[in-house]
Amino acid sequence: MAEEILTNESPELRDVGKPIIEVVNLTKKFGDLLVLDDISESVRVGEKVVVIGPSGGGKSTFLRCLNCLEDPTSGQIFFEGVDLADLKVDINEHRRKMGMVFQQFNLFNNLTVKKNITLAPVKIGIADLRKAKRHNAFTPLYNKLFDKFGAKYNEHIAKKREMLQTKVEQLKTELEPVVEAWEQTKTVEEVAGKSVVSYDPELTKKKLAIANKLEQTERALAHAVPAERRELIPLPAESAKAVREAAEENAMRLLRRIGLEDKADVYPSTLSGGQKQRVAIVRALAMNPKVMLFDEPTSALDPEMVGEVLDLIKQVADEGMTMVIVTHEMGFAREVGTRILFMAEGKVLEQAPPEEFFGNPQHPRLREFLAKVL
């Protein structure tokens, strides 16, 4: 039996069917250009959601918003139930759980293939080890100080939180009518085939000023956290050397699985386009992500190299990985996708399982698109 790419411990293999990404009223603008227009979608554990549509329809921007490589103009993105816009959330902590593969591979040309794959696991693994060691070293002293001053400190924090919460509610009340008036001034114009949105400049300035105060107050509230006793935590590894050895062992396992074990010590410049993209995929998998995001992974490849990359993605999909894939490969979308989204003009105009999507399209724009590409 062939060795699997995903490990048995991979978290994406659990909780199948449970929503892992939820997008609520997502809007993204670049200046006055409306790129994403009030999108609400969800991705469930184990799903392979394929996004297709004409160029300029917002597909790649939507994908980049999912792990906050692009900041949404408005709306919410929840990952495992956590609002990524919440000021208390460590975005980088959640990005670790989302592997992303880009059109142009984005390998480090000054590092060997193996170093490309081990770079992030080693850096993060050692950082986590040091953090755990610091935590355990200072915990006894911290607990002594907490026992002596904790009650008084928490009393002060409670008063501060009450004051900040009151200010937050006041600012929200102040902001609401301004936003309503601002929305009423919205105008949309078609310029060179793109939707350009504009609002009243004075109301925009007033809205941003209040929103900025609200954000600063919410940030202060998020940092006003009551103290509590700490517990010692287990170390994630015995040593930095152990972290490196585990990362290198996993890198070689992944390279062996995709038939590139002999390329471990060469540099990316010596690889073909297809080999580079396969390395980019296993580099993302080396972090043991819960979701994989693919942004047109074959668009920069020569036609004869597309198949080897698609075969690898299919294998990862068959092993249970949750995926969101932007692609122009219609046959691949039909074969791999459990649900297909059609995006155009910044909106999801239609979505359905592959058989229904390709066999019985409903939206006129989708029928027009499929007639051109199939």
Where do the PLM segments sit?
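Conserved signature/switch motifs of ABC ATPase nucleotide-binding domains
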Residues: 266, 287, 319
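ABC ATPase NBD coupling module
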Residues: 84-99, 135, 142, 154, ...
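Conserved ABC ATPase signature
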Residues: 267-271, 275
